[in-house]
Design a protein with these regions (language model features):
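Helix-loop-strand module that forms the ligand-binding subsite of alpha/beta enzymes
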Residues: 53-147
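N-terminal beta1-alpha1 ligand-phosphate binding loop
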Residues: 1-29
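Glycine-rich phosphate/pyrophosphate-binding loop and the adjoining helix
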Residues: 5, 26, 64, 137-185
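N-terminal beta-loop-helix "entrance" segment that forms/cooperates
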Residues: 36-56, 154-159
Length: 185
């Protein structure tokens, strides 16, 4: 499952997530793309109803997105860099996923991260670290982009369709997430 945290449809982040999903599909995984920027989602209001009921009190598209995450064996989560971190759209998903963590519904699912920025060292690693932290808190298994790079994940710069390193690290990540998810399922 690819999750695009960008508010822009068909932008640089979506391009790399799609490349990763294509590689995951080539490795044998069933693939699906979710665009948070196109979803009707609200931020967490800290009402704590999820603590009592196990479900979020807000009725919006997040419910369906979280259900898809529970059914998926692996995730590729992408975000553009916004002030060294993830977008508000992706942060809402993280905050609203509390009901999943309560029962560790993402435990042992495989996850990887992609970040795009305006320059090669434009905050991609800190953005990826935020996604990794989310996955670790959910007790998911975090993977990087694998051999030959063996770094944090997909890192894109500018016009990602022309960024060979960004394309390669994202494809490597997609393949790696799929291979491990298939082995574990």
């Amino acid at each position: 499952m690819g999750i695009v945290g960008s508010p822009r449809k068909e932008g640089n982040t979506e391009n790399l997530v799609k490349e990763a999903l294509k590689a995951a599909g080539d490795a044998g995984a069933d693939i699906e793309l979710v665009r948070l920027g196109s979803a009707e989602i609200e931020p967490c209001v800290a009402c704590d109803i999820c603590k009592a009921t196990g479900e979020c009190a807000i009725y919006d598209d997040m419910r369906e997105i979280l259900e898809k995450m529970v059914k998926a064996h692996g995730f590729i989560i992408g975000s553009p860099v916004y002030f060294g971190n993830v977008t508000s759209q992706l942060k809402m998903l993280m905050d609203r996923s509390r009901p999943l963590r309560m029962d560790f519904k993402l435990k042992n699912k495989v996850g990887g991260a992609i970040a795009t920025g305006g320059s090669r060292n434009g905050g991609q690693e800190t953005t990826i670290a935020a996604i990794h932290e989310f996955l670790l808190i959910q007790d998911a298994i975090v993977v990087g982009d694998g051999v030959p790079m063996a770094h944090y994940g997909g890192t894109g710069v500018g016009a990602t369709a022309e960024d060979e390193m960004g394309l390669q690290t994202s494809k490597n990540l997609g393949k790696r997430v799929a291979e491990l998810a298939i082995k574990l399922s």
